[in-house]
Amino acid sequence: MASEVDRSGRLAALLPRGPGHQFVFYGDACSGLPGLPHEKTFAAVNGVVRRLEPLPEFVLFLGDEIAGLTADAGALRAQWRHWLDCEMAWLDRVAVPLWNTTSNHTTYDAMSEAVFREIFADLPRNGPPGQEGLSYWVRRGDLLLVFVNTMWSGLGGEGHVETEWLREVLHHQRDARHKLVMGHHPVFPINGFSGAYQREIGPEHAGPFWDALVDGGVMAYLCSHILAYDVQVHRGVLQVCTAGAGTAHRMPEGVEYLHCAQGALDGEGLRYQVIDSEGRVRERLSWPLQMPPVSGWRSVPAGVSEAPLVGAPCDDRIVLLRFQGRAAPAGDGTAQTLLAAFDPEAVGALAPLWVGVCGTEQRLTVVVGPEARRSPHYWHGPSLAPGQPFDLQIVLHAGMGPGGLLWRASEDSPWSSLTAASAWGVERLGWPTHWSVGHASRGPSDQPFRGGALVVSSALSEVRV
């Protein structure tokens, strides 16, 4: 959704529903150099933060505040001083604390790590040995904030992060009702931009790192680095990337935009809104998802039937699907349809939405093709065991972009985003008039499901924040 632009008026901040916390998080300005373009773009985003009513209780900046990347310590200090004393002078950092993470533009060698410690001398020195002032944690009542260093030179530099200390902090602070972890690099690829160490945390760290978040009951990992806004969920924990604070590039261009994010935590969960540099609310999320019980979902008949949701693309709808059945025997890797959405009047057109299994491993696959004669995009999930029963739930969340195609194995299991290399999701999909269960749009012989006892049910919900 996008709100009307009012460049002079106040912007309503999301507030906790009862006791809680409200805050701003953003990253990647690459400024600190007076008179250069990023000073102007960063000022535009800060202008939006300054219009929030009320102002945030604290601000999380997720790295790449300055251009940095210089061998001259004096020049690096000067960039930091300009960023703090000029570009962020509007923020009363006594009333509204500012906490920062390390990043590739700011802590790229031993010298720059020392400058970071010097500039942010007031940050807690409670990190792991050797990382004091680079990794740290803060407790605000029932809220735990942990800041990890994804640039730790002692492990190898960019894309390397320590995990044992993180696990220990989460364990010792386990009484915190709300837990957020902040770092610069994502763990999971974003918008198809992928590369170990340079674009996301290295593979030897990524698994233990995410295990620590899941085991520690963390609500979200907030990161930046990839110049985009993106949200995914993996085993019930959100990865939220916000890297639009001023850097003039986009990943990809034409899709992403300058922005900040403002959020609220309370007893019901996390809500946030993503606001562009003109003050429009462009995207939003409330987590955990609120949805009707599975027992109340509507049965979808086998074969072709009218679709329960028809119309133009929208970003405020959630489609819930449940697939039960027995997987086909092993051996044949051709595609099998669970559900296809299509318009019979669109002669010769491929189904804009297809859900099924592909390959000899019978991997859950969702195909979304909103534009005729353009290659569709693919999302992949778990494999089905040949000949065995399965019960899968899928969410198509039009407010979550590419991370909004989710799956889980049961009502008690955590949600995870399907894997994709797309920069968009079902928000681009015009919803066709008909659904078919057990075969694709051209009839019973078109990519049929070869297993047995297929039962499909569905429900609709709306994005609410």
Mark where each language-model region is.
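N-terminal active-site segment of His-dependent metallophosphoesterases
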Residues: M1-R77, I190
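Extended active-site neighborhood of metal-dependent phosphoesterases/phosphodiesterases
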Residues: A2-L11, L36, T70-H178, G195-A220, ...
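A short C-terminal boundary segment appended to hydrolase-like catalytic domains
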Residues: D6, A261-C314, G404-L405, T419
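A carbohydrate-recognition surface predominantly in extracellular/luminal proteins
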Residues: G311-P329, A349-W354, L454-A459
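Glycan-recognition/cleft segments
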Residues: A340-V367
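Short, aromatic/His-centered strand-loop micro-motif at the edge of beta-sheets
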Residues: V368-D391
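Short tryptophan-centered beta-strand motifs in secreted/extracellular beta-sheet-rich domains
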Residues: Q388-A398, L405
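Flexible glycan-contacting loops in extracellular carbohydrate-active proteins
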Residues: S416-L454
